[in-house]
Design a protein with these regions (language model features):
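Intrinsically disordered, low-complexity terminal regions
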Residues: 1-405
Length: 405
């Protein structure tokens, strides 16, 4: 009778602790240890209540989260592997990596805590796999160095890694990702994206919200963005196939290749080439030394110290502003649609061997200087009655005005 009362008392006490949020271990947690080739592996699995928020925080290892439409609770499996020939040594290290799982309020926690000193074993790997209901409102994942992979969640997802890669797909709300140096890849995300890596590449397939992508030196590629983007890289290339809204792209030295942009564009590179297929708004493009090609834009400011410039001006229905095209040493070719109305002013400073040519009779070209001495070219005119100013200047190079077809 006394033992029965003690058992009942213990059960009631544990239940009270669990309800108060002080019970750390999951009730359904199980542990298995087995030989894995020359190493030893431990598998810890368990189940937690299907709450709306998940926090995973581990000292080492990868984290994988998958959302399921029919998933009710939260199921997790932690697999740890130590490269120890001795089972006794392996068990000692397994004991030093504490895995706890619990629910407190509306948040489920899964924690991997290395307690064996500041230095973790060299021959060690781990992965935490978590199955969650798709209707999670927030999933936050943190690892000191492993990869992070999350998909199939209707809410917001946040991930932080000390240096591993990060992958998101099929996320219903926004995402935030930060890694010390790994790559970041995003499939389809419905909300806003905030992506930061110390030096890895960033790739986004389809974003329905605004995109902020920053990397210390890797390349950035966006296939489709629905609401504009800000892209910054310390030196990698930038590629955007399609983006609605305003786009700002900046790199310390890589090339920038843009497709169809549904708003104004700001482009800046320390020395790479710039290419743009079309834009609905005004374009500002600047490079320290590469060529610039802007096709299908209403107006543009393009500047390079030593490259050629090609610009095609068309009426896109957007705001039209003054255009200014300038290079220190290179040719400039301007294609003008038949309905574009502009005031043209062009000049070539050192025109020996270079000149200004025009397919438009209303653009008048004249030269100054002797045939064998310093010579310069200028051109002025109004097309379709005039409009915003189109200023074109090169220190040494040809300038050509052509009909856009």
């Amino acid at each position: 009778m006394k033992r029965a009362l003690q058992t009942v008392g213990l059960a009631v006490g544990l239940a009270l602790l669990a309800s108060a949020g002080f019970l750390s271990k999951s009730w359904a947690q199980e542990t298995h240890i087995a030989r894995e080739g020359s190493a030893w592996g431990e598998e810890v699995n368990g189940t937690l209540a299907g709450v709306k928020i998940l926090r995973v925080k581990v000292d080492m290892g990868a984290v994988v989260v998958r959302g399921g439409q029919q998933q009710q609770g939260i199921n997790y499996v932690a697999h740890i592997r130590f490269g120890n020939p001795s089972e006794q040594d392996a068990r000692r290290q397994f004991d030093q990596y504490k895995i706890t799982a619990y629910v407190k309020g509306d948040t489920a926690w899964i924690v991997g805590d290395w307690q064996g000193g500041r230095r973790q074993p060299r021959h060690c790997s781990s992965e935490f796999s978590v199955m969650v209901p798709r209707e999670m409102t927030l999933v936050k994942l943190e690892t000191d160095g492993g990869n992070v992979d999350a998909s199939g969640v209707s809410g917001h997802v946040e991930a932080e890694s000390g240096g591993g890669s990060i992958h998101f797909d099929d996320i219903g709300a926004g995402v935030n990702a930060e890694t010390g140096g790994g790559s970041i890849e995003v499939g389809t995300v419905s909300g806003e994206l905030g992506l930061h890596t110390g030096g890895g590449s960033i790739e986004v397939h389809h974003a329905n919200g605004k995109v902020l992508a920053e990397t210390g030196g890797g390349s950035v590629e966006i296939q489709s963005g629905a609401q504009g983007a800000i892209i910054e890289t310390g030196g990698g290339s930038i590629s955007v196939r399609h983006c609605n809204g305003k786009l700002k792209a900046s790199t310390g030295g890589g090339g920038i290749d843009l497709g169809d942009i549904g708003g104004p564009v700001e482009i800046d590179t320390g020395g790479g080439t710039i290419k743009l297929t079309s834009a609905k708004g005004h374009v500002h493009a600047e490079t320290g030394g590469g060529g610039i090609e802007l096709y299908g834009v209403p107006s543009a400011q393009a500047e390079t110290s030593a490259g050629g410039i090609v610009v095609k001006l068309v009426n896109t229905g957007g705001e039209r502003r003054d255009s200014d095209l300038e290079t220190g040493a290179g040719d400039i070719t301007v294609y003008l649609a038949s309905d574009v109305a502009v005031n043209v002013w062009a000049s070539v400073d050192l025109a020996n061997g270079h000149k200004i040519t025009s397919e438009f009779p209303d653009i008048h070209v004249r030269s100054e200087g002797e045939s064998y001495g310093p010579k310069s070219y200028t051109a002025e005119g109004k097309l379709n009655g005039g409009g915003p100013t189109l200023k074109v200047h090169t220190s040494t190079g040809d300038i050509c005005f052509k009909h856009a077809h």
